[in-house]
């Protein structure tokens, strides 16, 4: 029985060999790298169900952060399933050929599945943070656009053989610098004005995100960019960063939101059994002549015009 269980080893690299469209990759993950990807996939999957389970304890109208956070780890679990299966990659000629046997060769496997993951999940991460800070939607959408620039330039740079890849790397770093600025300055101040509990939650999660995200360009530089470390080490490097940036971040964010009403952040969501007031609940018809309360703000708070 023990021999039978031991025989059930990871066979992904045999089923999906290191060849794509007739081109073989020289620098690839080994079984150890695949095993690590499976482990991260498992953590992402368990985290998804945990976040959804925590959401079930909230009213349906208060689950927005649970759904966004669960979506992040759900997408990541699929990406890590793909990479663990030795799929979602393409062989790219390296700019720097190394003598170290772990990174020796001409073609290195580049996991584009990782960038698809980031293209989908990093906007969700930023949405989590910026909605926590109560930032206006135009700012949220603009920061997401800058984030997409960062991810796409990273992918294009990884797929380029020549030194021009570092130009795309520079564009990506500039986009990252702007995102870190928004988190460290504008969003932090906005969250502080919403309330001390919101401010603490944002600082905790925003600081974690800013620090971890700054490490991604370093990983890119020694992996796809410089071909300095082996794909197995690349898997560990990116995997640890993703585990901190997604499930750990998600757990801290939801813990911080446990007593925060989303309505305080401008996220008042109507349930199916609630009445709709097109002009807001405080702008209902005031008399039979159709008079309305025109002294209410957009948030529904009444303002004395003579004050």
Curated annotation (Swiss-Prot):
Gene: carO
KO phenotype (gene knockout): Does not lead to any apparent phenotypic modification, including no change in the photoinduction of carotenoid biosynthesis.
Keyword presence, Iron-sulfur: no
Organism: Gibberella fujikuroi (strain CBS 195.34 / IMI 58289 / NRRL A-6831)
Coiled coil: none
GO cellular component: endoplasmic reticulum; plasma membrane
Region (Disordered) location: 280-307
Gene Ontology molecular-function annotations: monoatomic ion channel activity; photoreceptor activity
Record's protein name: Opsin-like protein carO
Gene3D superfamilies: Rhodopsin 7-helix transmembrane proteins
Localization, UniProt: Membrane
UniProt feature, compositional bias: Polar residues: 294-307
Family of the protein in this entry: Belongs to the archaeal/bacterial/fungal opsin family.
GO aspect biological process, one term: phototransduction
Transmembrane region(s): 36-56, 64-84, 118-138, 140-160, 166-186, 202-222, 235-255
